Protein backbone atom coordinates (compact mmCIF):
# COMPACT_ATOMS: atom_id res chain seq x y z
CA UNK A 1 0.00 0.00 0.00
CA UNK A 2 1.44 3.38 -1.02
CA UNK A 3 1.69 6.31 1.40
CA UNK A 4 -1.07 8.26 -0.33
CA UNK A 5 -3.46 5.29 -0.39
CA UNK A 6 -5.99 5.32 2.43
CA UNK A 7 -6.13 2.19 4.56
CA UNK A 8 -9.35 0.26 3.99
CA UNK A 9 -11.19 -0.89 7.11
CA UNK A 10 -14.47 -2.45 8.18
CA UNK A 11 -15.95 1.06 8.17
CA UNK A 12 -16.64 0.20 4.49
CA UNK A 13 -19.56 -2.14 3.79
CA UNK A 14 -17.68 -3.81 0.92
CA UNK A 15 -14.74 -4.62 3.21
CA UNK A 16 -17.14 -6.20 5.71
CA UNK A 17 -18.64 -8.26 2.87
CA UNK A 18 -15.19 -9.53 1.86
CA UNK A 19 -14.35 -10.47 5.46
CA UNK A 20 -17.67 -12.32 5.74
CA UNK A 21 -17.09 -14.17 2.48
CA UNK A 22 -13.65 -15.24 3.64
CA UNK A 23 -15.03 -16.20 7.04
CA UNK A 24 -17.78 -18.34 5.53
CA UNK A 25 -15.31 -20.19 3.32
CA UNK A 26 -12.84 -20.63 6.19
CA UNK A 27 -15.52 -22.05 8.49
CA UNK A 28 -16.73 -24.45 5.80
CA UNK A 29 -13.16 -25.59 5.09
CA UNK A 30 -12.56 -26.12 8.80
CA UNK A 31 -15.77 -28.13 9.14
CA UNK A 32 -14.78 -30.27 6.14
CA UNK A 33 -11.34 -31.06 7.60
CA UNK A 34 -12.69 -31.76 11.11
CA UNK A 35 -15.30 -34.17 9.73
CA UNK A 36 -12.62 -35.98 7.71
CA UNK A 37 -10.23 -36.31 10.67
CA UNK A 38 -10.92 -39.95 11.56
CA UNK A 39 -8.64 -42.74 12.80
CA UNK A 40 -6.45 -43.98 9.94
CA UNK A 41 -6.52 -40.70 7.99
CA UNK A 42 -3.21 -39.04 7.13
CA UNK A 43 -2.32 -35.48 8.10
CA UNK A 44 -1.10 -34.64 4.58
CA UNK A 45 -4.44 -35.66 3.05
CA UNK A 46 -6.29 -33.41 5.50
CA UNK A 47 -4.03 -30.45 4.70
CA UNK A 48 -4.56 -31.00 0.98
CA UNK A 49 -8.32 -31.30 1.45
CA UNK A 50 -8.56 -27.98 3.29
CA UNK A 51 -6.37 -26.09 0.83
CA UNK A 52 -8.17 -27.52 -2.22
CA UNK A 53 -11.55 -26.48 -0.82
CA UNK A 54 -10.34 -22.94 -0.11
CA UNK A 55 -8.93 -22.51 -3.62
CA UNK A 56 -12.10 -23.90 -5.24
CA UNK A 57 -14.48 -21.72 -3.22
CA UNK A 58 -12.51 -18.46 -3.43
CA UNK A 59 -12.40 -19.00 -7.19
CA UNK A 60 -16.20 -18.65 -7.23
CA UNK A 61 -16.39 -15.15 -5.69
CA UNK A 62 -15.79 -11.81 -7.44
CA UNK A 63 -15.20 -13.69 -10.70
CA UNK A 64 -15.46 -10.49 -12.75
CA UNK A 65 -12.65 -8.86 -10.76
CA UNK A 66 -9.79 -10.46 -12.71
CA UNK A 67 -7.02 -8.61 -10.86
CA UNK A 68 -8.38 -9.28 -7.37
CA UNK A 69 -6.18 -11.60 -5.31
CA UNK A 70 -7.96 -14.23 -3.22
CA UNK A 71 -7.28 -17.69 -1.87
CA UNK A 72 -5.30 -19.19 1.00
CA UNK A 73 -4.24 -16.73 3.70
CA UNK A 74 -2.69 -19.47 5.83
CA UNK A 75 -2.16 -23.07 4.66
CA UNK A 76 -4.25 -25.78 6.32
CA UNK A 77 -2.23 -27.14 9.23
CA UNK A 78 -2.99 -30.21 11.33
CA UNK A 79 -0.92 -30.37 14.52
CA UNK A 80 -1.28 -33.46 16.70
CA UNK A 81 -0.77 -33.91 20.46
CA UNK A 82 2.36 -32.07 21.67
CA UNK A 83 2.98 -30.35 18.31
CA UNK A 84 2.04 -26.72 19.03
CA UNK A 85 0.90 -25.44 15.63
CA UNK A 86 1.39 -24.98 11.86
CA UNK A 87 2.25 -28.60 10.97
CA UNK A 88 1.66 -28.84 7.23
CA UNK A 89 4.03 -31.50 5.85
CA UNK A 90 5.11 -32.03 2.26
CA UNK A 91 4.20 -35.19 0.37
CA UNK A 92 7.85 -36.22 0.62
CA UNK A 93 7.94 -35.77 4.43
CA UNK A 94 7.17 -38.52 6.95
CA UNK A 95 3.38 -38.46 7.36
CA UNK A 96 1.32 -38.99 10.51
CA UNK A 97 -1.81 -41.13 10.63
CA UNK A 98 -4.49 -40.15 13.12
CA UNK A 99 -5.63 -42.55 15.81
CA UNK A 100 -8.25 -42.58 18.56
CA UNK A 101 -7.37 -40.30 21.46
CA UNK A 102 -5.17 -37.91 19.45
CA UNK A 103 -5.57 -34.23 20.35
CA UNK A 104 -5.76 -32.48 16.98
CA UNK A 105 -5.41 -28.74 16.29
CA UNK A 106 -6.50 -27.54 12.85
CA UNK A 107 -5.85 -24.00 11.66
CA UNK A 108 -6.25 -22.34 8.26
CA UNK A 109 -6.88 -18.95 6.69
CA UNK A 110 -8.74 -17.47 3.73
CA UNK A 111 -8.50 -14.04 2.13
CA UNK A 112 -10.68 -12.17 -0.31
CA UNK A 113 -8.91 -9.13 -1.79
CA UNK A 114 -6.35 -9.38 1.00
CA UNK A 115 -8.92 -9.26 3.83
CA UNK A 116 -8.06 -12.23 6.03
CA UNK A 117 -10.22 -14.68 7.98
CA UNK A 118 -8.29 -17.17 10.14
CA UNK A 119 -9.98 -20.02 12.00
CA UNK A 120 -8.86 -22.91 14.21
CA UNK A 121 -10.36 -25.78 16.17
CA UNK A 122 -9.06 -28.33 18.68
CA UNK A 123 -10.66 -31.72 19.31
CA UNK A 124 -9.97 -35.31 20.35
CA UNK A 125 -10.25 -38.02 17.68
CA UNK A 126 -12.95 -40.57 18.49
CA UNK A 127 -14.73 -38.53 21.15
CA UNK A 128 -18.54 -38.61 21.29
CA UNK A 129 -21.34 -38.41 23.88
CA UNK A 130 -20.82 -42.05 24.75
CA UNK A 131 -17.04 -41.57 24.92
CA UNK A 132 -16.42 -38.10 26.47
CA UNK A 133 -13.06 -36.44 27.13
CA UNK A 134 -11.73 -36.67 30.68
CA UNK A 135 -8.57 -35.83 32.58
CA UNK A 136 -5.86 -33.45 31.42
CA UNK A 137 -7.03 -33.40 27.79
CA UNK A 138 -10.41 -32.14 29.00
CA UNK A 139 -8.70 -29.54 31.20
CA UNK A 140 -6.58 -28.07 28.42
CA UNK A 141 -9.42 -27.93 25.88
CA UNK A 142 -11.78 -26.28 28.39
CA UNK A 143 -9.05 -23.81 29.34
CA UNK A 144 -8.41 -22.88 25.70
CA UNK A 145 -12.13 -22.48 25.05
CA UNK A 146 -12.59 -20.13 28.01
CA UNK A 147 -9.52 -18.11 26.97
CA UNK A 148 -11.05 -17.64 23.51
CA UNK A 149 -14.35 -16.57 25.09
CA UNK A 150 -12.50 -14.08 27.30
CA UNK A 151 -10.73 -12.60 24.27
CA UNK A 152 -14.05 -12.12 22.48
CA UNK A 153 -15.18 -9.96 25.40
CA UNK A 154 -11.91 -8.12 26.02
CA UNK A 155 -10.75 -7.24 22.50
CA UNK A 156 -12.84 -4.09 22.17
CA UNK A 157 -12.16 -0.36 21.78
CA UNK A 158 -10.59 1.21 24.86
CA UNK A 159 -9.18 -2.00 26.33
CA UNK A 160 -5.46 -2.83 26.46
CA UNK A 161 -3.70 -5.88 25.01
CA UNK A 162 -2.26 -6.55 28.49
CA UNK A 163 -5.77 -7.18 29.84
CA UNK A 164 -6.12 -10.16 27.50
CA UNK A 165 -2.70 -11.52 28.46
CA UNK A 166 -3.54 -11.33 32.17
CA UNK A 167 -6.96 -12.95 31.72
CA UNK A 168 -5.44 -15.85 29.77
CA UNK A 169 -2.86 -16.48 32.49
CA UNK A 170 -5.53 -16.57 35.20
CA UNK A 171 -7.84 -18.89 33.25
CA UNK A 172 -5.04 -21.31 32.33
CA UNK A 173 -3.72 -21.41 35.90
CA UNK A 174 -7.18 -22.29 37.22
CA UNK A 175 -6.96 -25.51 35.15
CA UNK A 176 -3.30 -26.09 36.12
CA UNK A 177 -2.34 -25.35 32.50
CA UNK A 178 -0.03 -22.78 30.88
CA UNK A 179 -0.38 -20.54 27.81
CA UNK A 180 2.49 -21.20 25.39
CA UNK A 181 5.19 -18.65 26.20
CA UNK A 182 5.64 -15.75 23.80
CA UNK A 183 3.02 -16.73 21.21
CA UNK A 184 1.44 -13.70 19.51
CA UNK A 185 -2.01 -12.78 18.23
CA UNK A 186 -1.76 -10.16 15.48
CA UNK A 187 -3.79 -7.28 14.20
CA UNK A 188 -4.93 -7.92 10.61
CA UNK A 189 -4.93 -5.39 7.78
CA UNK A 190 -5.46 -5.73 4.03
CA UNK A 191 -2.73 -8.06 2.73
CA UNK A 192 -1.07 -8.02 6.19
CA UNK A 193 -1.42 -11.12 8.39
CA UNK A 194 1.08 -9.98 11.03
CA UNK A 195 0.12 -6.40 11.86
CA UNK A 196 1.98 -4.17 14.32
CA UNK A 197 -0.35 -4.47 17.31
CA UNK A 198 -0.15 -7.83 19.07
CA UNK A 199 -1.38 -9.73 22.12
CA UNK A 200 1.30 -11.84 23.78
CA UNK A 201 0.74 -15.06 25.71
CA UNK A 202 2.52 -15.86 28.97
CA UNK A 203 5.51 -13.55 28.35
CA UNK A 204 8.89 -14.14 29.98
CA UNK A 205 10.28 -11.22 32.00
CA UNK A 206 12.28 -10.03 28.98
CA UNK A 207 9.35 -10.45 26.59
CA UNK A 208 7.10 -8.51 28.98
CA UNK A 209 9.64 -5.68 29.00
CA UNK A 210 10.04 -5.65 25.21
CA UNK A 211 6.43 -6.20 24.17
CA UNK A 212 4.65 -3.01 23.15
CA UNK A 213 1.49 -2.15 25.07
CA UNK A 214 -1.40 -1.17 22.81
CA UNK A 215 -5.00 -0.07 23.00
CA UNK A 216 -7.66 -1.64 20.80
CA UNK A 217 -9.37 0.88 18.52
CA UNK A 218 -12.58 1.09 16.50
CA UNK A 219 -12.56 -0.75 13.13
CA UNK A 220 -9.46 -2.83 13.96
CA UNK A 221 -9.43 -6.56 13.18
CA UNK A 222 -7.48 -9.21 15.11
CA UNK A 223 -6.71 -12.89 14.66
CA UNK A 224 -6.81 -14.30 18.19
CA UNK A 225 -4.54 -17.33 18.65
CA UNK A 226 -5.05 -19.26 21.89
CA UNK A 227 -2.42 -21.93 22.59
CA UNK A 228 -2.59 -23.71 25.95
CA UNK A 229 -0.48 -26.59 27.29
CA UNK A 230 -0.77 -29.05 30.17
CA UNK A 231 3.00 -28.63 30.53
CA UNK A 232 5.09 -25.62 31.51
CA UNK A 233 4.18 -23.73 28.33
CA UNK A 234 7.64 -23.59 26.73
CA UNK A 235 7.73 -24.72 23.09
CA UNK A 236 10.76 -26.74 21.99
CA UNK A 237 12.14 -27.55 18.56
CA UNK A 238 10.63 -30.87 17.50
CA UNK A 239 13.26 -31.46 14.81
CA UNK A 240 10.80 -31.05 11.92
CA UNK A 241 11.69 -28.78 9.02
CA UNK A 242 9.80 -25.59 8.29
CA UNK A 243 7.32 -25.94 5.42
CA UNK A 244 5.37 -22.66 5.73
CA UNK A 245 7.00 -19.42 4.61
CA UNK A 246 5.99 -15.84 3.88
CA UNK A 247 7.48 -13.22 1.58
CA UNK A 248 8.58 -10.07 3.39
CA UNK A 249 7.57 -7.11 1.16
CA UNK A 250 9.87 -4.77 3.12
CA UNK A 251 13.01 -6.69 2.07
CA UNK A 252 14.63 -6.29 -1.34
CA UNK A 253 17.35 -8.59 -2.67
CA UNK A 254 18.73 -9.15 -6.16
CA UNK A 255 18.43 -12.89 -6.92
CA UNK A 256 21.26 -14.12 -9.14
CA UNK A 257 20.14 -17.61 -10.13
CA UNK A 258 17.42 -18.10 -12.74
CA UNK A 259 15.74 -20.85 -10.69
CA UNK A 260 15.60 -18.52 -7.67
CA UNK A 261 14.02 -15.75 -9.73
CA UNK A 262 11.49 -18.20 -11.19
CA UNK A 263 10.59 -19.48 -7.72
CA UNK A 264 10.28 -15.97 -6.29
CA UNK A 265 8.10 -14.68 -9.13
CA UNK A 266 5.80 -17.69 -8.68
CA UNK A 267 5.51 -16.97 -4.94
CA UNK A 268 4.81 -13.29 -5.65
CA UNK A 269 2.20 -14.09 -8.30
CA UNK A 270 0.33 -16.76 -6.37
CA UNK A 271 0.65 -15.73 -2.73
CA UNK A 272 1.67 -12.06 -2.64
CA UNK A 273 2.59 -11.49 1.05
CA UNK A 274 0.48 -14.35 2.47
CA UNK A 275 2.03 -17.42 4.12
CA UNK A 276 2.30 -20.43 1.81
CA UNK A 277 3.37 -24.04 2.05
CA UNK A 278 6.15 -25.51 -0.08
CA UNK A 279 3.75 -28.36 -0.82
CA UNK A 280 1.91 -26.15 -3.32
CA UNK A 281 5.20 -25.42 -5.12
CA UNK A 282 6.61 -28.93 -5.38
CA UNK A 283 5.98 -28.94 -9.13
CA UNK A 284 7.63 -25.56 -9.83
CA UNK A 285 10.76 -25.95 -11.95
How would you name each of these model-derived features?
Residues 1-285:
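Active-site neighborhoods and metal-handling regions in enzymes and metal-associated proteins
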Amino acid sequence: MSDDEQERTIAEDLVVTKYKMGGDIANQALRLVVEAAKPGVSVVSLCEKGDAYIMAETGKVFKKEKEMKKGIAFPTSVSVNNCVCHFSPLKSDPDYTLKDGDLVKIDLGVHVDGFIANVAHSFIVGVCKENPITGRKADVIKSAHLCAEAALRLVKPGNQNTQVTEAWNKIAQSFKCSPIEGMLSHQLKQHVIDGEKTIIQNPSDQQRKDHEKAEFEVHEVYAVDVLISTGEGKARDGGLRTTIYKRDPSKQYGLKMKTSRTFFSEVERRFDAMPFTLRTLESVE
